[in-house]
């Protein structure tokens, strides 16, 4: 059995009697250097510090035989090692004794409800994944450099006015809180930030919308416009944890909206134009999502992570591209393709006649001034073919 004991910055004094008893009866305890240093002299077990990288050492543990003990920060099941151990060895072989999490302590200090505060871990993730367009979050830092790195990104993406509080050594005798704005932390960060810190962010300006307008994206005109983007995402029907291939991605707007739709949704964007690839990366960072940006399709398909769903937004008439997309799609996966030219419409109509699926045509109008009145200006019609691979 592997027993995981959560411990806070207050060390042994903050533990329950059950947790203290487990540590005192242990023969071997694994943990980080900082966590092991929190144990007092009543704990006589041999102490093993995790190496870097840690995962190979964790995989080498054996839950058979004598009990193994692990110390972890706060609640080990909240972005902690407890989840990894259960995934590797099964819940029957792992017992978790949680402590109060840093998230709970931070929310208490800020006066925020835990249940409606987003939790983001930057322990291993890149800082741009914590960029948001509104709301509030507790961000778990990787180290002392994380607050400034996140503050710089927020400022670069127009979020410099965000309320930005760094809370250090939560629950311990050296606890400290420093309030400011993202812009202030980006321009003049303190030099003595503790390694053990979390960030409480209230994102400003608050521009949360279900569907971001076209002007929220960097693009050169190659973008699936807002009304069609909504219809396209409905046809793609994202589900949690699925991966999208956005082929002929243009601005990457479909990939970005896909990643925002459900937890765990990821995207790979294929785009031949270098400037557009830069736009995709910028848009992904601006919306706080991760999009794997690659080159021309289908040449860049080979070493990309396999898709659950494919959107073909450009290159429908490119010889062999539609067939390559269908070949890469797993059984049961959806492919959705949009067309605006007569030639690309013909290609989709031919695919529909061969493979079935659903063929739709969308036409929408925008109301615009017409003299002293209002008239309807037609937008380019869009033909859409969707099919499920059998």
Swiss-Prot record:
The record's top EC class is transferase
Q: Name one GO biological process term.
A: cobalamin biosynthetic process
- Keywords assigned by UniProt? Cobalamin biosynthesis, Methyltransferase, S-adenosyl-L-methionine, Transferase
Reactions that this protein is recorded to catalyse: precorrin-6B + 2 S-adenosyl-L-methionine = precorrin-8X + 2 S-adenosyl-L-homocysteine + CO2 + 3 H(+)
| Top-level lineage group | Bacteria
UniProt-listed CDD domains: Precorrin-6Y-MT (cd11644)
The pathway where this protein functions is: Cofactor biosynthesis; adenosylcobalamin biosynthesis; cob(II)yrinate a,c-diamide from precorrin-2 (aerobic route): step 7/10
Q: What is its EC number?
A: 2.1.1.132
**Could you tell me one molecular function GO term of this UniProt entry?**
precorrin-6Y C5,15-methyltransferase (decarboxylating) activity
For this chain, the family text in UniProt reads: Belongs to the precorrin methyltransferase family.
Protein name in UniProt: Precorrin-6Y C(5,15)-methyltransferase [decarboxylating]
Can you name the source organism?
Mycobacterium tuberculosis (strain CDC 1551 / Oshkosh)
């Amino acid at each position: 059995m592997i027993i995981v004991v959560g411990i806070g910055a207050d060390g042994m004094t903050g533990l329950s009697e059950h947790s203290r008893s487990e540590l005192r009866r242990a023969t071997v305890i694994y943990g980080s250097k900082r966590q092991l240093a929190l144990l007092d002299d009543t704990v006589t077990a041999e102490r093993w510090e995790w190496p870097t990288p840690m995962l190979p050492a964790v995989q080498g543990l054996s839950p058979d035989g004598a009990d193994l003990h692990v110390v972890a920060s706060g609640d080990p099941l909240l972005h902690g090692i407890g989840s990894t151990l259960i995934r590797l060895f099964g819940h029957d072989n792992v017992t978790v004794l949680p402590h109060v999490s840093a998230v709970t302590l931070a929310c208490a200090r800020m006066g925020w409800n835990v249940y409606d505060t987003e939790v983001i871990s930057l322990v291993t993730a890149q800082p741009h994944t914590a960029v948001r367009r509104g709301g509030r979050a507790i961000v778990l830092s990787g180290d002392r450099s994380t607050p400034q790195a996140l503050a710089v990104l927020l400022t670069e993406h127009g979020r410099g006015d965000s309320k930005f509080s760094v809370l250090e050594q939560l629950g311990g005798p050296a606890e400290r809180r420093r309030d400011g704005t993202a812009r202030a932390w980006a321009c003049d960060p303190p030099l003595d930030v503790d390694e053990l810190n979390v960030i409480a962010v209230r994102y400003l300006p608050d521009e949360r919308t279900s569907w971001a307008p076209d002007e929220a994206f960097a693009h050169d005109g190659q973008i699936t416009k807002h009304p069609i983007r909504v219809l396209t995402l409905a046809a793609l029907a994202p589900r949690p944890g699925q991966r999208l291939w956005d082929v002929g991605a243009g601005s990457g707007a479909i990939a970005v909206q896909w990643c925002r739709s459900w937890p765990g949704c990821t995207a790979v964007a294929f785009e031949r134009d270098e400037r557009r690839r830069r736009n995709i990366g910028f848009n992904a960072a601006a919306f706080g999502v991760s999009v794997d940006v690659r080159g021309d399709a289908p040449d860049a398909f080979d070493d990309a992570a396999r898709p659950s769903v494919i959107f073909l937004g450009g290159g429908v008439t490119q010889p062999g591209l539609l067939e390559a997309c269908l070949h890469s799609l797993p059984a049961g996966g959806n492919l959705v393709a949009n067309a605006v030219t007569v030639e690309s419409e013909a290609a989709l109509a031919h695919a529909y006649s061969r493979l079935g699926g659903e063929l739709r045509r969308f036409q929408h109008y925008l109301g615009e001034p017409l003299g002293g009145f209002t008239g309807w200006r037609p937008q380019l019609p869009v033909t859409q073919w969707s099919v499920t691979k059998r």
